[in-house]
Amino acid sequence: ELPDGEFPTVSYPNPEAAEAFELGLKLGKKVDADLILATDPDADRLGVYVKDAKTGEYHSLTGNMSGCLIGDYVISQRKEKEGLPKDGAFIKSIVSTNMADAIAKYYGIQLVEVLTGFKFIGQKILEFETKGNGTYLFGMEESYGCLTGTYARDKDAVVASMTLCEAAAYYKTKNMTLWYAMIAMYERYGYYKDDVQAITLKGIEGLEKIQKIMNTLRENTPSEIGGY
């Protein structure tokens, strides 16, 4: 059966939206799945629901949570199997969780912050390769995107899905679900709460309002926001 490019089962095929998981959750509960994955149409962002084995409930992971789960797993496995390079780097966007900082500190690698947009992570990878000033280990942004290798310069939900499934299998051998692996990370690195508020401005009026806001920011750029 060929996929339908119109995505008729959802009004908005976005892995950040709960409605995109309605059919997946229904099937997941039926077959008792450990995790449920969904990507966006171009397969660069990954949404995840994981099962709580004690309650049977499925919990949604934010992009920060899934990114940290994958990043911690990738880095820990590399450390165990071949050791970490002295100049190893974990790259994140400036709006991503500070748990990434704690993970980098725990493994003794550098934490590199870049501007919002995965292209800046890609640029940093290129800089590492050309200048020899770092070894890329993992990169993530809070908007459900990450990259586990240097084969690409953009986020990739296909390999992220594979890696998260591998992590789930690894933790299952230790009698842990991904949900409890996440809780274990909170206990090790500290508790971090994040929330994303999306504001949609529709139509021509919405576009005009957006342009007005952006023009105001460019012409009268604030020196601080919220006291920072």
Q: What does each of the following model-derived ranges do?
A:
Residues 44-64, 100:
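Short Gly/Thr/Asp-enriched flexible loops that form oxyanion-binding sites at enzyme active sites
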Residues 2, 9, 67, 76-80:
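A short, conserved beta-to-alpha structural element at the edge of catalytic cores
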Residues 62-74:
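Catalytic or ion-translocation cores adjacent to nucleophile or general acid/base/metal-coordination motifs
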Residues 19-23, 70, 120:
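Well-ordered alpha-helical segments embedded in enzymatic catalytic cores
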